[in-house]
Amino acid sequence: MNAQQPRAVRPAGLWPGAPGFHREVLRNPWYRLLGELQNSFNELTVEFWRRRGGQTLHLPITTGAVSSPIGLGSDSVPVRVDLGGAPTFLADSMQFTLELGCRMSRRACYYIMPSFRGEPSDETHLGQFFHSEAEIFGDLADVMRYVEDYLSYLAEQLLARHHSAVVNAAGDISHILALIGGDSFHSITFDEATELLDEGDIVDHGSWRTITRAGEQRLMQRVGSPLWLTHWDHLAVPFYQAFSLTGRSLNADLLLGPGEIVGCGERHIKAQDVRRALALHKVDPVPYEWYVDMREVDELQTSGFGLGVERFFMWMLRHDDIRDMQLVPREMGKQITP
């Protein structure tokens, strides 16, 4: 079915935690669909990695070594908490522990778990969201292929399981069918993107550049989507991404629907390269001494990715506000029940 259909199911838009929100969750079929998609997403992720020999890990949500610390290239603000009198952080990612898991198990490792960011929510960003993350053996090209296979598999299987409900919520499923049908994933370097975009789409910070959300949308319009945006300035990304031969970063963001839904990258192999990156990004090396030492013990080439689950659902349901992708809303700086 390619034609646009009326949207029979829509969210309430009652975030964050408006009085009676729990009643809306019980009444509105949007939230029932969301719960079903979440369940299927988890089941399908387990099956995807089972077929590829991957291993899941149960990891804590607190860490003393956030993957986006205060420093150049960090893409989020750490959430500091007090844990029995000890200052620590709610994890923005446990990617570093996935790297440890790869060395321990000699297998790809993955999880689906909450991610905490210290910024207010808006139309495309949640301060608390779910992250499907994995670390594999291989380089940047290898992990990009994993992501493409994973997204195509999720789209096909989720549509097969929930076809009628997805049509009722999205109104049009041509974008899903296109991805399932093998539409090519486009790819462009950050340097190439700057030649295609308008003034204001790229923000020049002096030693590094970033792209605006409007720039992401314009780039997809001009090049196509899904679109890989690769090889960013190294100071524009976190320190753990490996250096390319030209000094750029061996990383890639996948743009689809609301914008960036996947971030991935190749990791440093050698301890000396991690030390160099920490110094370049002006990050305190003390919490990451174990991360450096891990490479002294076992040098491996791994790469990893993180998929924002709610952003993926935004794309699938053709929705324009990620805050409607929460069964139980959360907002930075607010006490919300349930």
Predicted segments, located by residue:
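Class II aminoacyl-tRNA synthetase-like tRNA-binding/catalytic domains
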Residues: 1-137
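Generic solvent-exposed, charged/amphipathic alpha-helical segments
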Residues: 42, 46, 50, 148-155, ...
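Intrinsically disordered or highly flexible coil/loop and linker segments, enriched in small
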Residues: 50-55, 156, 160-164, 202-203, ...
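Flexible domain-boundary/linker segments
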Residues: 66, 151, 164, 326-329
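Long, charge-rich alpha-helical interaction segments
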Residues: 160-189, 196
